[in-house]
Amino acid sequence: MKNMKQCEKLEKRKRELENWIRKAYDATGNSIIEGYRAHFKRWKKTYPIEFQIKTIRKGGAFPKVSVLVDSMFMAELKNRILTSGHDLDEIRGDLIFDVSRGGERYVKLNGEEQGAKAGDVLLRDGEGLLATVLFGPARRTSITPETRNVLYLAWCPYGIGEELIRGHLEDIRSNLELAYETLEVGIGIYV
């Protein structure tokens, strides 16, 4: 599938989701948010989705990046589940989730080099880091206008049930279906 800049049906769903976040969304006492807060707090960092939700509640809007990115971001804010998207064709070798020993380095989406923090969760392939929970995905496997095959990963704290994770990934699929007539989708949950 060809990554598109935007899709009118997806833009309409964005406006609906923005309205829901502004009018009906309540993050008070949310166990998903609390799980992420606990992880980020260890490093005196804040859970980025919480900030993004507050921005929309104050009148902000979803950005227009591309259909492959926007579909993921919408599901992230709806479900509060941190997700990374990767160009599957740029991944080299096996994927390995691990806990950082500290100092592993990679280049983030913004082009800055970043060292992983000891104890953070990371993902790597045969060439190096693809993402960390604290600092996000690497530029090397980022979704670009040329991306044809995408891998979405939900980064979940302990305690989020499989049903919620599967529902989150199905929301991404549903968003993509607004733009693409045919999709080849596989959903797997690995703990």
Question: How would you describe each model-predicted region?
Answer:
Residues 1-191:
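Non-transmembrane, aqueous-exposed alpha-helical and coiled segments at domain scale
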